[in-house]
Swiss-Prot record:
Pfam families referenced in this protein's UniProt entry, alphabetically: SVWC
PTM note: Contains 4 disulfide bonds.
Subcellular location: Secreted
Recorded family membership: Belongs to the scoloptoxin-16 family.
UniProt-listed InterPro entries: SVWC_dom
Tissues of expression: Expressed by the venom gland.
Organism taxonomic ancestry: Eukaryota, Metazoa, Ecdysozoa, Arthropoda, Myriapoda
Record-given protein name: U-scoloptoxin(16)-Sm1a
Signal peptide: 1-19
Keywords assigned by UniProt, alphabetized: Disulfide bond, Secreted, Signal, Toxin
A cellular component term, taken from the record's GO annotations: extracellular region
Length: 108
């Protein structure tokens, strides 16, 4: 029974310190952000994952939680005669794909 109580208190403490929610990771009482890459990052500064074309940002909310925000490319949907144009190599958002449509022929 004591082991169960210890495990319950420990798991509750861990869940209060670290929570993963939609939109990012949250940490309490930290002055740096431990990003999803496992590295420490300064608050209120961007960092990038060029291989996966993502941008990250950490900030403190009104409750003192440090929140990691991840920004991905928008969904590119090509309809009709349009096509998906791959993004350039490099940082977000330049690496994101875009939709390219042919220009309509102008009547002479």
């Amino acid at each position: 029974m004591n082991l169960f109580l210890v495990l319950f208190v420990f798991s509750f403490s861990v869940s209060q310190f670290f929570a993963v929610e939609a939109g990012g990771r949250k940490h309490k009482h930290q002055e740096v952000c431990i990003g999803s890459d496992g590295k420490g990052h300064q608050l209120n500064q961007f960092w990038y994952d060029n291989g996966n074309c993502r941008r990250f940002y950490c900030y403190k909310d009104e409750d003192g939680l440090v929140i990691e925000q991840t920004t991905n490319c928008e969904l590119a949907v090509a309809e009709n005669d349009c096509r998906i144009k791959p993004g350039k190599a490099g940082r977000y958002p330049d690496c994101c794909p875009s939709v390219e449509c042919p220009q309509e022929s102008k009547a002479s």
